Amino acid sequence: MIELKAVSKRFLDHVVLDQVDFFVKRGETVALLGPSGVGKSVLLKHIIGLIRPDSGDVLVDGLSVPHLKRKELAELRSHIGYVFQNGALFDSMDVFENIRLGITNEGQYRDLMYAAERVRECLRLVNLQPEVAKKMPAELSGGMRKRVGIARAIAGKPTYLLYDEPTSGLDPVNSDVIDTLIERLQQELGVTSVVVTHDVRGSFRVADRIALLWQSKIRAVGTAEEILASHDPAVQQFLERDLEMAVLQGRKD
């Protein structure tokens, strides 16, 4: 289980998170929804200890992440797969080596036979052919880079998957491919997932519950139906804004 308790964070005079309470149950997929720049990625980085809260606590499986020692934090991170927004692939390494980096057990990482089989399996899980392993990141499309990033995140057989804007920069077709993949991995691997996104439609599709982060606070938490039925002005404002943006995008297309 992941739990944030009254977490606050500011950068200089800008309050990013203000007394945020948030939890994800085992086996659940929760979408953290909100406009760009609202602090969703900051919240996600608290979970893996890349950012420490100014106040409050972050718990993963009952462990207080801000209070873990370096070795304890490394052990916790070995159970968490993180999908970076831009893919964060190393351009000097081929796809095989990029995915291999996700194998968190050092013995398995060094075992080339195990690594080769694991990379092949991860490529299969993200619907990429084995020969993609030989390609360099520069040869991949945007959608393929995203899928390789996901393959690396699952290479260590994590308990948790954290997705930071997995469909950002993709067209609607490739966004649907990634959303379908997130759903399937949840079913096949049984992982607990947090999906950071600004896409209302995608969040409604992949998540068991949605948490709306707006103006530094969690404004609503619930199923897609509950979010749509909310009378909270902040929730309605965000949904109307997303609808307007979708209409404008449709006109451009």
Regions found by a protein language model. Name each.
Residues K157:
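Conserved catalytic motifs of ABC-family nucleotide-binding domains
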Residues M136-L140, M144:
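Conserved ABC ATPase signature
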Residues L63-S64, L112-E131:
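Conserved ABC ATPase "signature" region
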